[in-house]
Amino acid sequence: MDNQQRKVQGSSSNTFIKRAFQHLKSLFTVCFTGADYLESDIELICQNEIQPQGLEKLNADSSNFYCNSLTSNQSLTTSMEALDLSSSLTTPHADKLLKLSNLIAAKSFTTERKLSAAEFLDSREIHNPFTYGFLGILYGTSRTPYLHAQYANSFMSESAVPISIELNNREAKASMNLAEKNFPEGFEDFVSFLENPNIPLTVLLHHVMLYDLYSNNLKDAVWVAVTNYMKNLVGNYGYTELHIRAAQQMFGHPRFLLVHPEDIYCISGSSDWVCVSTQHFHCNIHVHSVSGNAIRKSRNPIIQDLSSICQNSTEFGWLALTHALRKKGAIFPIHAYLNFNAKLYEECIPPSILYFNKNDENINVGNIEDITNYMYETFINEASLCDKFMKRKHERIETPLSSQGREISNTLSRKRGAKGSNPFEIENMMPHA
């Protein structure tokens, strides 16, 4: 591809990004005011400048967008407060991106460590790689984060109206806590299994997305699983020893640590926004302040330890950003981000915006008996899945992990079938779906 072709492609991509975000902001206003928005819902965003190349390959179309996500589920309700807040934010057109080393916090790190700016600081603007796919905006506070999301392609159809999500999972946490108390053996056995290496990405991601509902014991196991997964990625996707140490120290949120560091960018001309961007995923993230002082002056031993092993401005920028996000990462759609690479779903867009499985949404509204049954079946199925995964990986050679998978699955079944093991199933019947 010659320079002229690259210019045309870059210009087309930039125009698409701008129009898509203008459309998104207009739709936010409409959702809040209740006004009609029919004409521009079917307008051609890119005016034939970009064709939806390979769209059929992803089994995607404009209507494939969370059609069933607006439920009575308390974690998935449209938030008027979120829509109101969005109107006070100036969302940047993220057509020009910069590497994470361009954060102010990262630049100060380069100066203080007397590092070569040429070696560690790359200020060249990068064209946004996004062409079509998942388009979102994450903002709010750590206490109350919000997410706007929609599917965006060349044609913005009326079915692509964005959803405004407020993370409110207090009742789900209480329900999960009661389920764990009523079935402690199952949770304890699955903790020991989750802490073993080489579990499938689907199992890991499922529990990463349930992380905020879990007890401390199970949260610790999720972090161990994330650490084991990331150890296999060091040297790829921007992962370094810093990121492994961060996972070991349970720093940040596990959802955000699964984002490949090389896909995180600064937005040119904006100090309050960063983004995660790939060819088929783009999410703008509002951060109030990414300050190097918060890292340098922190008395938190974990932050001090992580800061001491930063080798360059990009690593320090990632550390400062992760610290600034805090628990806002709890609503980051990590499954949508990984879906286009790992093909986790048959659909182009995940069926649930907040959880890995659509059925996980029932934890917010189900009774304790149903939740206990659901988690039991989940543990059994995933232990079996891990066993099959290890068999394929080692070509049916017996391994300690595959043996443990069967043992835990059988142990759970025995415990579940024992008299009195389930307070909700008097006759000890197998749980229903």
Swiss-Prot record:
Q: What name goes with this protein?
A: Meiotically up-regulated gene 131 protein
Write down a Pfam family by its short name: UPF0300
Q: Which parts form a coiled-coil structure per UniProt?
A: none
Major location, coarse class?
Golgi
Question: In the UniProt record, which is one GO cellular component term?
Answer: Golgi apparatus
Q: Where in the cell is it found?
A: Golgi apparatus
Q: A GO term (biological process) for this protein?
A: meiotic cell cycle
Q: What does this protein do?
A: Has a role in meiosis.
Polar residues composition bias: which ranges?
401-412
Q: Which UniProt keywords apply?
A: Golgi apparatus, Meiosis
Membership in a protein family: Belongs to the UPF0300 family.
Query: Region Disordered: what ranges?
Result: 401-433
Query: This protein's superkingdom?
Result: Eukaryota
Q: Does the keyword Coiled coil apply?
A: no
Q: Which InterPro entries match?
A: Meiotic_expression
Q: Does the keyword Metal-binding apply?
A: no
